[in-house]
């Protein structure tokens, strides 16, 4: 599925929509196939070299998603007061905080020699590994989203009603006895 998404994003969204709107369907399909082949080669290389890299990338991806998306989703469901400005500010705070922390210890885009500090426990903030920093980013996201949402206008009434309807599902009808 991910390979299909990558090839479609490159061939249709990037090439057809932006770079070459006149590309034929056959040309777009050819670009998609080439992109998929390149993605397979890159994924295979990164999965093998260095060993353990794929597991680290998955851990970092979950940390990044947790720091940037999870708080906004939770607050969007459980708080009628969280607004778009708060959610965006929180998401950016979570995302930027974890990316900066990762780049400080792992290097910019994992390029050797670009790390600011050694990736060892004695240098980590409160002993928190870059692989685990997503929890800190999520906490920062919650705090910033809460502060910004309460410092700005609340969401419109229809949005607050939508949040309430998500929190308290009504179902399709009454309960029945089987």
Residue map of PLM features:
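Membrane-embedded helix-loop-helix hairpins and adjacent transmembrane boundary segments
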Residues: 1-178
